[in-house]
């Protein structure tokens, strides 16, 4: 065991907080206007019908309705919110 800290150990000991990214509301879930659907870096998932996009690329619902994930083209996905007809 070393009796001095050493040069490396005093420079360590930092860690950043998790960013808590990802899908917050899944397909088939009912959402109200303003609910966050996805937090993301970049546009991995595009905004579809009745979905807004924030300045940090967060996707959120513009209306009350049901979430649906759809294909944008072969590679990309989009998320839409459709009004419920109950």
Curated annotation (Swiss-Prot):
Q: What are the boundaries of the region Disordered? A: 1-20
Q: Where in the cell is it found?
A: Plastid, Chloroplast
Q: Which UniProt keywords apply?
A: Chloroplast, Plastid, Ribonucleoprotein, Ribosomal protein
Give start-end positions of Polar residues composition bias: 7-19
Q: Which SUPFAM superfamilies match?
A: Ribosomal L27 protein-like (SSF110324)
The UniProt entry's GO CC annotations, sorted and at most eight, read: chloroplast; cytosolic large ribosomal subunit
UniProt-listed InterPro entries: Ribosomal_bL27, Ribosomal_bL27_CS
Task: Please give the chief subcellular localization of this protein.
Answer: plastid
- Molecular-function GO terms, alphabetical: structural constituent of ribosome
Q: Which GO terms describe its biological process?
A: translation
UniProt family annotation: Belongs to the bacterial ribosomal protein bL27 family.
Q: Which HAMAP family does the record cross-reference, listed alphabetically?
A: Ribosomal_bL27
Output this protein's name: Large ribosomal subunit protein bL27c
Q: What is the organism field in this record?
A: Guillardia theta (Cryptophyte)
